[in-house]
């Protein structure tokens, strides 16, 4: 039977040589350029500068979308153009991909990150629509 284990029953395991050492994988630093533009306000009253600032604060999240796919396709570069509809409460109601020179994974990831941003409430109480270009390339 499986009775209690006394301390005398436990034996140490000896690790010798390199068994306990993990090999460090070299990480290659890739410089990435991401052009940050001002949003093009299409409809409604929303401060373009405030919108641009909210998007810039999430720059790393957008870059991560590109970096992940760059590992699979080293020559990946291009533009993702989004049309964003912001509701009267400042939440994103919809994000459409108007143009995508990259691949579907980057486009969908960028759209998803944009959808999660809270924007200022549009003046006048209506929804606001703007377009925003993301241009990615290796630097």
Q: Would you name each region that the model predicts?
A:
Residues 44-49, 60, 64-76, 104-139:
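Short, positively biased Gly/Pro-containing turn/loop motifs at secondary-structure boundaries
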Residues 1-56, 139:
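Intrinsic-disorder/low-complexity signature in envelope-associated proteins
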Residues 4-7, 22, 26, 74, ...:
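A generic structural signal for short, solvent-exposed coil/turn residues
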Residues 14, 26-44, 62, 72-102, ...:
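Short tight loops/turns at secondary-structure junctions
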Residues 54, 83-85, 96, 133-137:
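Generic structural detector for well-ordered beta-strands
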């Amino acid at each position: 039977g499986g009775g209690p284990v006394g301390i005398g029953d436990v034996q140490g395991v000896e690790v010798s040589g390199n068994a306990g050492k993990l090999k460090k994988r070299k990480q290659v630093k890739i410089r990435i350029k991401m052009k940050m533009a001002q949003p093009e306000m299409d409809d409604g009253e929303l401060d373009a500068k405030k919108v641009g600032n909210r998007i810039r604060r999430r720059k790393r999240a957008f870059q991560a979308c590109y970096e992940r796919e760059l590992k699979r396709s080293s020559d990946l570069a291009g533009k993702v153009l989004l049309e964003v509809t912001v509701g009267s409460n400042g939440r994103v109601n919809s994000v459409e991909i108007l143009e995508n020179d990259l691949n579907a994974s980057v486009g969908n990831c960028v759209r998803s990150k944009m959808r999660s941003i809270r924007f200022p409430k549009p003046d006048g109480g209506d929804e606001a629509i703007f377009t925003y270009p993301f241009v990615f390339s290796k630097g």
